[in-house]
Amino acid sequence: MTTKNTSGRGQRELRVRVKTAKGRKLSSTLWLERQLNDPYVIRAKKEGYRGRAAYKILELDDKFGFLKPGGRVVDLGCAPGGWCQVAVERVNALGQKKNKPEGTVLGVDLQEVEPISGAEIHQLDFLSDDADEKVKGWLGGRADVVMSDMAAAASGHKGTDHLRIIALCEAAAAFAFDVLEEGGTFVAKVLAGGAENELQALLKKNFTKVANVKPPASRADSSEKFVVAMGFRGRASEPEEGEA
């Protein structure tokens, strides 16, 4: 590994260059070099977040203000935990803001996640038959915010990956419709590809405001974007059984 000093406009930057080790693919070397030089990765290490993804939800909340002290948050696909960390801070789950109400944060992921102070974490396959009932039991009431950063393992085929993540978003949205308080917020990561249009239409029927955002922390070469649906209309907006 080597470093190179570059300067511009009076500032010096230190860029890390990674040599391709024996047995390591060039693509792996380039990924590692990008990680080591990514300002969000560097910032996350300094500020104690578990990954650069924390800044995506920070930037979304800075823009829309859905994480409030006293709020009840469910984070689906929470590994490695950056979104939960942000939620804990913003809803005052640790009670560090003495003059503000304390919120709660519940995280769920297929993978095991290291404990996060102020959050309740469970390992669970959210697509299993009884998953939503389990999560509702752990939640013990309604939620103000449901966030989903769920993603299926990459297949290498963009169309397939797009359809898989849309299916996860639809499952998360169905759960949100069931647990959100009226006026609540749903936030989810999607991959652009066309199939998200039906999801958008569904959300617009159930929320007063739906926005598609690519926050600065989302890499420019990524097809990911985030849907932020605010102002949940409530379960009364759903058709009654037998209604056409």
Curated annotation (Swiss-Prot):
EC number assigned by the record: 2.1.1.166
| Reactions the enzyme catalyzes | uridine(2552) in 23S rRNA + S-adenosyl-L-methionine = 2'-O-methyluridine(2552) in 23S rRNA + S-adenosyl-L-homocysteine + H(+)
Keywords, comma-separated and alphabetical: Cytoplasm, Methyltransferase, rRNA processing, S-adenosyl-L-methionine, Transferase
Catalytic residues identified in the record: 189
Give the molecular function GO annotations. rRNA (uridine-2'-O-)-methyltransferase activity
List locations, semicolon-separated: Cytoplasm
**Matching Pfam families, A to Z?**
FtsJ
GO CC terms, sorted: cytoplasm
Residues annotated to bind S-adenosyl-L-methionine: 81, 83, 109, 125, 149
Signal peptide positions are none
In terms of InterPro entries, this protein maps to:
RNA_methyltr_RlmE, RNA_MeTrfase_FtsJ_dom, rRNA-MeTfrase_E, SAM-dependent_MTases_sf
Which family is it part of?
Answer: Belongs to the class I-like SAM-binding methyltransferase superfamily. RNA methyltransferase RlmE family.
Question: What does the record give as the function of this protein?
Answer: Specifically methylates the uridine in position 2552 of 23S rRNA at the 2'-O position of the ribose in the fully assembled 50S ribosomal subunit.
Protein name (record): Ribosomal RNA large subunit methyltransferase E
Species name for this entry? Cereibacter sphaeroides (strain ATCC 17023 / DSM 158 / JCM 6121 / CCUG 31486 / LMG 2827 / NBRC 12203 / NCIMB 8253 / ATH 2.4.1.)
The gene from which this protein is expressed is: rlmE
